[in-house]
């Protein structure tokens, strides 16, 4: 199982606009439940902490495999959500990780191979050819 977690801040010059944007984001992503093969679980949480360094919203998803996450990135329903949200989302952070504890796979070194200079371990910066850095949202 692969977990895909994305956090954002949303645009909005005032509290009412930000609240509308958060509600739209939550509704759009929740509309993906049951529509994407291999997407096992989806949650959208809006921050309640009120701390100034928190992100506004988190998307927590579980996929049956890495291949399912890759397919999700190009699935028509996911692409529809991306279009619907436009540039509403800012300050994006992402982490993808194997939750099965696959033996022999080191999540830091990607099975023992050294990361190229500047590579992102957390998956924040997409990296061509590296499945852990797939840009999905």
What are these regions (language model features)?
Residues 66-87, 91-93:
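C-terminal structural segments of small proteins and small subunits
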């Amino acid at each position: 199982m692969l977990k895909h977690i994305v956090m954002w801040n949303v645009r909005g010059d005032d509290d009412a606009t930000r609240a509308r944007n958060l509600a739209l984001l939550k509704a759009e992503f929740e509309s993906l439940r049951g529509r994407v093969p291999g997407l096992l679980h989806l949650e959208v949480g809006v921050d309640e902490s009120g701390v100034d360094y928190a992100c506004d919203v988190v998307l927590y998803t579980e996929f049956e495999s890495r291949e399912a996450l890759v397919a999700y990135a190009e699935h028509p329903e996911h692409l529809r959500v991306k279009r619907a949200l436009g540039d509403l989302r800012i300050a994006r952070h992402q982490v993808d990780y194997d939750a099965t504890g696959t033996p022999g796979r080191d999540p830091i070194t990607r099975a023992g191979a050294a990361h190229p200079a500047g590579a992102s371990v957390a998956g924040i910066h997409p990296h061509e050819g590296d499945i852990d850095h797939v840009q999905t949202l």
